[in-house]
A protein has these predicted regions:
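Histidine/cysteine-enriched polar flanking segments
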Residues: 2-263
């Protein structure tokens, strides 16, 4: 787990265009102005002047496409799962953030194989299928990753079954057992994304799911937008009324909204 008690500077390797404020919503989906229960509002942090530079300095984001949709019951520490414990053993440190997602495996062989698992790696925007119980393979994977910083894209297809990611991915922190604030907010943000993506005819172009702890539950409403070009947009303190602006600026375009940015 990353310690983000003080502000840190991201090592993300690409240029990003900024806009200062999130555009207001153009329509009400029925979820746009939903709020968490009033008793939870008291426990949510008031927006500070800025939440910039509150993600850790990243080399790579690596997340398991677990297919486990029951994010409310993910254990507080996902390392309880063998695959997460194994991958964390070899991958922790060196600026790697390792998480679990609710996204389903993309390889049929992986889906039907109890040993092979799918991981997505950014900013390389690649998915690999790997034997999560094979320490030799895991060690080999992280030797490659750790010998190349995020400014240097790596070609994993030379060593593993790998494929480029061709869709935008939106992952919302909904790790309820880690922090109830993220569990509750994550659900209403997820619902609004579903409605907006449908209205904008983007549901086939964007994968939407949940991700485990990414640091900074104090900024509940955390999410990351991952683009096929490798760009990553880290946001915090998101509410449903921000979603249309995020879709317009960071999914349809490559702009980062500064008031919600954690990078």
């Amino acid at each position: 787990m990353f310690n983000i008690s003080h502000k840190l500077t991201s090592k993300l390797p690409f240029q990003i265009r900024y806009i200062q404020q999130c555009p207001p919503p153009k329509y009400d989906t029925g979820c746009t102005y939903c709020n968490p229960p009033s008793e939870m509002e008291e426990n949510l942090k008031s927006p500070p002047e800025s939440i910039r530079n509150t993600i850790p300095p990243l080399n790579r984001l690596i997340f398991h496409r677990s297919g486990n949709k029951d994010h409310d019951n993910w254990p507080k520490k996902v390392e309880v799962f063998d695959i997460m414990r194994n991958i964390s053993k070899f991958g922790r440190g060196n600026g790697n953030m390792i998480c679990m997602s609710s996204l389903s495996p993309i390889n049929e062989m992986t889906t039907n194989d109890q040993q092979n698992v799918d991981f997505a790696i950014y900013p390389d925007a690649q998915t690999i299928s790997i034997n999560g119980n094979d320490s030799t393979e895991l060690e080999k994977l992280f030797k490659i990753i750790n010998s190349n910083d995020s400014n240097n894209s790596i070609s994993l297809s030379k060593h593993f079954r790998a494929s480029k990611i061709d869709k935008t991915i939106v992952l919302i922190c909904g790790h309820t057992q880690r922090d109830i604030r993220c569990g509750v907010l994550g659900k209403i943000i997820h619902k609004e994304f579903e409605e907006v993506l449908k209205r904008e005819n983007l549901e086939n172009d964007v994968e939407l799911g949940y991700i485990s702890h990414v640091g900074g539950h104090v900024y509940a409403g955390n999410l990351v937008i991952l683009k096929p070009n490798g760009k990553m947009f880290w946001y915090g303190m998101v509410r449903p009324h921000h979603v249309q602006g995020l879709v317009d600026q960071s999914i349809k375009s490559d702009d980062l909204i500064e008031e919600l940015s954690r990078q």
